[in-house]
């Protein structure tokens, strides 16, 4: 079986991005690094980060999706990754290097896929008002 590894084209700052990502995720390591590129492993997922220049830009059309078990984890990751970047909607943010992340509590897909469609709609409506996802507010909205 072939291995699929995301290849991310950055406009400089590869070393700074690698330093941020490996500091934010405790289960991460740098596999190799040069001024042009680095390969990192974050929570078992390898990423190649390439210093390709301004020819191409990262876009929210591709993002890294992070499952979070607790609000504390959502809060910590959100704060560290959004610093110098930008908040977006529905759990999305863009870090200071232009990479989009989805910081999503594990309860969110469960609520959105609830067989009680009214409950799922209430959760969806609540999520659509949020930047960073608030688990307690989602659960409260889902309950009605």
Name each model feature, range by range:
Residues 16, 48, 95:
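Short, electropositive, low-hydrophobicity segments enriched in small/polar residues
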Residues 28-59, 102-105:
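Conserved short beta-strand elements that form part of the metal-binding/catalytic scaffold
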Residues 76-82, 87-92, 96-112:
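Conserved, surface-exposed functional patches that form binding/active-site neighborhoods
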Residues 1-19, 24-32, 63-64, 107-144:
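N-terminal beta-strand motif that seeds the catalytic metal site of vicinal oxygen chelate
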Residues 4-11, 37-41, 56-80, 85-90:
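Vicinal oxygen chelate
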Residues 45, 99, 133:
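Conserved Rossmann-like nucleotide-cofactor binding loop
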